[in-house]
Amino acid sequence: MEGPDVHSSEAVIDNGSFGKRTVRFETGLLARQANGSALAYLDEETTVFAATTASKAPKEHFDFFPLTVDIEERSYAAGRIPGSFFRREGRPGTEAILAARLIDRPLRPAFTKGMRNEVQIVGTVLTVHPDDPYDVLAINAASMSTSLAGLPFSGPIGGTRMALIDGQWVAFPRWSELTRATFSMAIAGRVVGDDVAVMMVEAKAPEHADIVINAGGAKPTESVVAEGLEAAKPVIRALCEAQAKLIGECGKPVGDFPFFPDYTEEQLEAVTESIGDRLQPVLGIVAKAERDEALNDLTASVVEELAERFPEEEGMLAAAVNAAFKKTMRHHVLTEGVRMDGRTPVEIRTITAEAGVLPRVHGSALFQRGET
């Protein structure tokens, strides 16, 4: 798009023999009433637009950060018109729901803890090349719009997919290239000093991976996957630098937002002193249900003991007890090398699988991992 108010920047990713991919960011023309908005292009073929808005007043009665991420697919993005009786866009498909979750996971922890203003990030798929996945592009679009919005957000965040194809890690692989992959990872992260901090990884092996490996394809061993994470860092850095350029030109100053911490340091100190050594017996209970019941009893006891000192702050005291429990549990695992259920840090829960558990239906299965 062109115009006097349009600003853009781009990142070029070199995949060697697989060619180059160009991600371009653009802002200043669409959704000017939103706190922040941005267009993200992948090779000028696939386009995702993202808009970020925030409420002016906090939701004080919430004990969580009310962030909503939505991805809206448009039929015209693929050159189609809805063919049903109601010529409207339907409910989000599976791919859109998974893309929204992929965005939420790295962006949510980047907001300052204790924020209670409602934030909505809406991504719209405007155009899509049939050979390009749009989900990781949407991560970058959402990060760009949120970074421009003047919110307490420690971005920008870059996202890419890395696929192991013919022994090489390829960024932003096409669908046709993924048919030759033995492993792929969606990775998101941000630049921290001279390094890139990985914030989210979603990895999987394609259904045909065994066929490719048996035909001589590279096996995704632990060391090979680690190489893939390292290969993603220059890509994420390039994406973050392109976003940072636009933030410097068009970003709003961070507004004054109130924060509501789960508990105060004074409350945590008081809770820790009140608990004393009473957490150790709780850590020794192997059965999860019994352990939870014992922790609830301990929490109620501590809250009652401190009620006079901290009136009408039962919820914050309970959160402080939970924080003290997590800290003690982590210390116990690191020092003793044993988790609460008796497993070592490298042991997994018992896994069982059974097929044909229901009568009459064509197929049924039961998969269990420990008590889950």
Name each model-derived stretch.
Residues 1-55, 59, 156, 255-372:
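Extended amphipathic alpha-helical scaffolds
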Residues 2, 15-19, 76, 80, ...:
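Residue-level signal for well-ordered alpha-helical segments
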Residues 2-14, 18-21, 35, 47, ...:
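Alpha/propeptide regions of enzymes that mature by internal proteolysis
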Residues 30, 49, 103, 113-167, ...:
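Glycine-rich anion/phosphate-binding loop at the beta-strand->alpha-helix junction
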Residues 34-120, 125-132, 197, 201-214, ...:
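Glycine-rich, flexible beta-strand/loop modules in the N-terminal catalytic cores of phosphate-handling
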Residues 76-89, 127-138, 250-273:
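Short, surface-exposed loop/turn segments at secondary-structure boundaries that line and modulate
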Residues 152-285:
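Mobile "lid/hinge" segments at catalytic clefts and subdomain interfaces of large enzymes
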